[in-house]
Amino acid sequence: MSISIQQISYIHPDKEVLFSDLNFAISKGQKLGLVGNNGCGKSTLLQIIAGQLSPSSGVIVRPDDLYYIPQHFGQYDSLTIAQALQIERKQQALHAILSGDASNENFVILDDDWNIEERSIAALDLWGLGQFTLSYPMNLLSGGEKTRVFLAGMDIHHPSVVLMDE
């Protein structure tokens, strides 16, 4: 699936225009690098494409399985590895089902991903993080380890599109 950016603008809360009327498309299999001076809006644009920030105007068409690796990880310090990787709900649903709570909601959340924990642990191991559990706090990891946690997320989620901020 491709990404389409149509007439995207972003205005800071203080009314400063960061960028306006951006238009471009990225086709399946295409690789793109954003290059520009510090503060020109590269990270903001990636956050908008990822759906983590709303544009001031414009339309974005993106795949549902897009995966975003941020530049800075401080906002994840209060989370566990499982929470940062956005697998905690599936993990909880799996444990609930295995404990006898066969509610439809748990099956919907799990979405037949019965090996989510094994895949996640294997991905962490692949990225040199096999010593950490999924419940390990992100704030106890080094910057490089946090980066590798998010890189492991690519192996867990198998996204069609990956956005990497530096």
PLM region spans:
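Conserved hydrophobic segment flanking the Walker A/P-loop of ABC-type ATPase nucleotide-binding domains
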Residues: 26-28
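The feature captures the beta-strand-to-loop junction immediately N-terminal to the Walker
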Residues: 35-37
